[in-house]
Structure formats: structure tokens, C-alpha cells
């Protein structure tokens, strides 16, 4: 029997301490028919920090930022070229793609009732342009400062940005120094000044439909903003976000309808959630991104003096040895399909796979294949029965001395039951191939901190998704010096990749030139293996219609499902009484 199924049965046989701790606090939400309870992450230590550009804030780690700070445009990642006007009513490119103009929605207001102005939006772009630590959105460097005229914001870039259309429109708008919002003088704590500053719930001046009015270490409470006017008044008047230690705790809460909406893997969801009430309990798991084994090629890796991960040939062998079918069927219980292309493209991007379509052996290489490949590239099995650096060529590639035994660890949160099982299976497979790979389980908070400080050897992590291949490539390949470290967690650097990313960003999607650049980047993914594509990551979206209806479904794809994206406010404003 699957270990995950056993864990889920144990969780259901006795209510865990984590659920007990929050159950009394969510009772109020259950008794109030218009307060929705949701969660999108487990094992996160709640801290009173809602800074939307701080990777360690609870707002970021629990995907709560877009409840209060809205994007300019709501782009639908499920449907190419489909979008909803939001803080901006449109996004227009000039003929060369270097000038982008947003028209600000006259209905957009801060939570004190003052309008969101074009000048404030332009000011934010200028602030993040000069403060890399706040540019978590990957906005390219501006050629000249952003300007405002009337209700229009103009951004000018040195190169075309057609491929960045969705990314630019998805920038969250928040108060920054120099905005001069009425009632909040310079120096007020509502203004966000750095990616590491703390913003308490009482200091959130948002432009979204909900504000964090209650906070403790077990429950975060949001209430409707009285100045939200961009949609009809939402039926959902409040949002509760409880703390759960692990996926199994969230499962128990879903089954008992203490949770209305969950955005993480629910072990054995059909048996333990759907079967308990098929009429009201539902899930929708479309493939939204590519899950990869992300290699840290920087010197800060814990095992950087022996991991051999600086060598692309070693990374290639590791990737090819992995049994992706096993990960799909056991670790992800069939809800995430194995990645079939070394390009990393999702099924929604499959038209761009080019010559890299279906080029994985989904069961992984045999031991004989792994052995031949590694021996051909300068490795040999040592006296401990593990592969080690054996030639000057391999020593030069790995930056390690001859006879160094290759050893690294895969690090993921223990609360992510699927990733924990995936890494165990990868380790077992590679150990069987005489590659010394171990696993490290950490808390979710520690994992997030380690990601941004490059304090890991390898990790299983989701991708950027979207319908445009550029968003995936930029996430994996962009030099972190260009993005303030917000992406490319493995610190992979390749000048050819940078040039190809710049070229791709300036091309219109679907053109022959666009495909040619995609092929170049796919070749880098294939041959250099900065990350190893594993699975087509599901957008975990479990919900109940016991109290609310209007959810995203396979036949009503008006937004990206699940509570973990910028679409969360759009979805909440669509929900009505069941």
C-alpha cells in the first residue's frame, strides 16, 4: 500500500494537534456563511509580515499578497491572449515592442478611498527599477524612467518586450516611497521601501478586495475592503487562513468542511475527500507548470566541495537516470504526469517543443547506460561503490580534485508529502546506480529561506508555468544578478542563455523567429541541464460547494484555479451563495 495512503488514513483516524489548534478559530468562519476559509501552503510559520516583495513574509509564503495588492491585468494562464481588466484597463505595445502603455482603471482605489493614480504606478516601476531587492517580478531594466500622463503609464525599455506582456501586466501594485497617498505622509509604514522590511497587517494599505485585519500565529483573518469598486460587491465578506503543519492536516480540515478551498496536494483525494461527499467536494488539477529537480551550481551549496553538480555531464546523467513514471504514479498518485521533453515545456506549451519532443525514457536509464555515460565522461566507481571524479577532464568540469566522491542531497519540506516521497524515490534510484544522493527534510519556512540564500544542493520545485515558453525559461535561466535573486535559485549562469532570453523577449509568440529562439533555449536545457524536468505540476485546487459556488472548473476556465496565484481575488469576487 502506498505510504501516502497510509499517512492519509492515519490523519483521518485521529484529528492531529495542528487541526485541533485551529479548529476552534475557524468555527466562526463556518458559522458565518460569507466568510471563506482557505490555505495554499502547509508548515509555514506565521509571522506578522505582509510585505509583498519579501520572500520570507507570510503574505508571500502563503500566497496572500494578491488579496490586498492587485496586478495591473488579470491574465488567464489557462487561455492564451485572454485577460481581465483590473488595476489597468489595457496594456498596449508600440510597433517595436519597446514602449508599453497601461491605462489605469478609474475604479481602482486604495483602501482609504483615494484613487490609484498613474503617477503612483509609474513611481512603483521606477522604484523597483532601481532597487533589485524589490523587483521580484523580473521587470527588465527601463531605458528611461517610467512616466505618467493623465491616466496612462508609459514604460520604455532598451529592447522589445513582447514576450514579457503577461509578466509586466502581472506586477502587483503597492504603495512605495514618493506616492503621496492622502492621509499617509512620507515615512508612513504603509510605504514599502525594501524587500526585507516588515509590514504588519495593521499597516497594509491595499487596493484589493480584502485587508488582513486579524493576525495570530494560528489564524490570519481578512475582511472586505469598503472601497473595493472594480467588481460588484463580493458575496465573500471575509477570508480566514489557518495554519496547518502538513498536507494531511489540510485533508482532515477539507473533509470536515473546516476548509472551503485548498491549494496543496491532498493525499488520496478521491478516497478521503471526494468519496465523503461527491455532490459537494471537488478538485481540479490542470497541469500548470513543470516541476523540476533544481540543481544548485553555485559555490554556496552545502556540498559544493563534493557534489559534482558543476559538471553538465554529471547533471545529465542524474536527469536521465530518474524514473519519471514512478514519481508520477506513486509520489503524485497519478495527478501529475511525467515530463516528456528535456525542454521543460508544459502540455500547454507543447507546440514549442520542436526537436525535443518526447525525448525522455520515462522509466529512466538502466544502470548499464548510466555507467557507460559517466565512465565516458571521466567518472569511475570508487571503493565505496559510488561514482567519483576519475580524470582531469572531469576534474576541470566539476572544479573538484580527482578521486572526489560525488555526493549531494535533495532538500524539500517534510510537510510536502508528495515532494518528500518523490525525493526518496529519486535517491533510491540514483543510489542503485551508484550515485550517492541523499535527502534532507526541513520545515517549509527554512526551505524558503534556503532557496533564496542558495543553501541547498538540489530541490524539487515547481516552475513558472504560463502559456508563453519565455516565462518558464526566464525562471530557470535568467542570471539572478538581473532579477535581484528572485528567480534562478540554482544560480546558473550562461551568457548564451542571457542573449537568447533577450532575443526571445523581443519576438512575437508563434512566429518562426520565436520558435528558433525557443529551440536554442531548449538546447541549453537539454545539454546543460540547469534543472531536470520531472513532472507536469498540477495546480492543486480542492474545494467544496457546501457554501460557495462559481469556482473555476474544466468547463469554466475564467481564471487559473487554486488560491496560490494572482487570480485569487478574481475568483473570490466571482463566488456566490450555493
Language model features with spans:
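Gly/Pro-rich hinge or "lid" segments in bacterial periplasmic/extracellular proteins
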Residues: 58, 77-78, 172-234, 238, ...
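Extracytoplasmic/peripheral linker and loop segments enriched in polar/acidic and small residues
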Residues: 313-316, 328, 363, 432-447, ...
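Long beta-strand-rich cores associated with HINT superfamily self-processing modules
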Residues: 543-578
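Surface-exposed binding/hinge segments that line
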Residues: 137-189, 546
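Aromatic- and charge-enriched surface segment that lines or borders ligand/interaction sites
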Residues: 89-133, 149-156, 250-256, 307-311, ...
Amino acid at each position: 500500500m502506498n505510504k501516502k495512503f497510509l499517512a492519509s488514513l492515519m490523519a483521518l483516524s485521529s484529528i492531529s494537534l495542528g487541526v485541533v489548534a485551529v479548529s476552534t478559530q475557524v468555527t466562526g468562519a463556518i458559522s458565518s456563511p460569507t466568510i471563506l476559509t482557505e490555505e495554499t501552503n502547509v508548515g509555514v510559520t506565521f509571522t506578522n509580515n505582509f510585505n509583498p516583495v519579501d520572500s520570507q513574509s507570510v503574505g508571500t509564503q502563503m500566497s496572500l499578497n494578491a488579496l490586498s495588492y492587485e496586478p495591473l491585468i488579470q491574465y488567464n494562464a489557462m487561455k492564451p491572449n485572454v485577460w481581465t481588466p483590473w488595476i489597468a484597463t489595457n496594456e498596449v505595445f508600440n510597433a517595436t515592442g519597446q514602449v508599453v502603455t497601461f491605462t489605469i482603471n478609474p475604479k481602482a482605489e486604495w483602501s482609504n478611498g483615494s484613487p490609484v493614480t498613474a503617477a503612483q504606478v509609474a513611481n512603483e516601476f521606477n522604484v523597483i527599477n532601481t532597487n533589485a531587492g524589490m523587483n521580484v517580478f523580473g521587470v527588465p531594466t527601463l531605458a528611461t524612467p517610467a512616466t505618467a500622463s493623465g491616466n496612462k503609464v508609459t514604460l520604455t525599455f532598451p529592447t522589445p518586450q513582447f514576450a514579457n506582456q503577461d509578466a509586466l501586466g502581472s506586477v502587483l501594485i503597492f504603495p512605495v516611497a514618493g506616492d503621496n497617498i492622502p492621509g499617509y505622509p512620507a515615512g508612513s509604514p504603509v510605504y514599502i521601501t525594501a524587500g526585507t522590511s516588515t509590514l504588519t497587517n495593521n499597516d497594509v494599505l491595499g487596493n484589493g478586495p480584502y485587508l488582513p485585519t486579524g493576525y495570530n500565529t494560528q489564524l490570519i483573518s481578512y475582511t472586505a475592503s469598503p472601497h473595493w469598486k472594480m467588481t460588484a460587491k463580493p458575496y465573500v465578506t471575509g477570508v480566514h487562513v489557518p495554519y496547518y503543519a502538513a498536507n494531511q492536516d489540510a485533508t482532515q480540515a477539507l473533509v470536515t468542511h473546516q476548509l472551503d478551498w485548498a491549494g496543496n496536494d491532498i493525499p488520496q483525494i478521491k478516497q478521503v475527500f471526494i468519496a465523503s461527499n461527491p455532490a459537494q467536494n471537488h478538485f481540479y488539477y490542470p497541469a500548470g507548470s513543470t516541476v523540476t529537480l533544481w540543481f544548485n551550481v553555485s559555490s554556496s551549496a552545502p556540498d559544493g566541495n563534493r557534489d559534482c553538480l558543476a559538471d553538465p555531464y554529471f547533471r545529465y546523467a542524474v536527469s536521465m537516470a530518474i524514473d519519471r513514471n514512478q514519481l508520477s504514479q506513486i509520489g503524485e498518485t497519478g495527478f501529475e504526469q511525467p515530463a516528456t521533453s528535456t525542454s521543460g515545456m508544459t502540455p500547454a506549451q507543447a507546440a514549442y517543443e520542436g526537436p525535443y519532443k518526447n525525448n525522455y525514457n520515462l522509466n529512466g536509464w538502466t544502470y548499464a547506460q548510466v555507467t557507460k555515460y559517466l565512465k565516458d565522461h571521466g567518472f569511475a566507481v570508487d571503493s565505496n561503490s559510488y561514482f567519483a571524479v576519475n580524470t582531469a577532464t572531469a576534474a576541470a568540469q566539476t572544479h573538484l580534485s580527482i578521486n572526489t566522491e560525488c555526493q549531494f542531497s535533495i532538500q524539500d519540506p517534510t510537510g510536502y508529502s508528495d515532494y518528500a516521497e518523490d525525493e526518496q524515490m529519486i535517491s533510491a534510484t540514483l543510489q542503485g546506480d551508484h550515485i550517492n544522493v541523499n535527502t534532507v527534510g526541513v520545515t517549509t519556512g527554512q526551505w524558503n529561506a534556503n532557496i533564496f540564500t542558495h543553501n541547498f544542493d538540489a530541490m524539487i520545485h515547481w516552475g513558472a508555468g504560463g502559456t508563453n515558453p519565455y516565462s518558464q525559461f526566464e525562471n530557470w535561466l535568467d542570471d539572478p544578478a538581473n532579477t535581484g535573486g528572485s528567480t534562478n535559485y540554482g544560480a546558473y549562469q550562461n551568457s548564451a542563455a542571457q542573449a537568447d532570453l533577450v532575443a526571445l523577449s523581443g519576438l512575437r509568440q508563434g512566429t518562426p523567429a520565436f520558435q528558433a529562439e525557443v529551440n536554442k533555449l531548449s538546447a541549453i536545457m537539454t545539454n546543460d541541464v540547469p534543472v531536470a524536468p520531472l513532472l507536469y505540476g498540477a495546480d492543486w485546487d480542492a474545494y467544496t460547494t457546501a457554501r460557495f459556488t462559481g469556482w473555476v472548473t474544466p468547463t469554466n476556465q475564467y481564471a487559473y484555479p487554486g488560491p496560490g496565484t494572482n487570480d485569487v481575488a478574481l475568483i473570490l469576487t466571482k463566488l456566490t451563495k450555493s
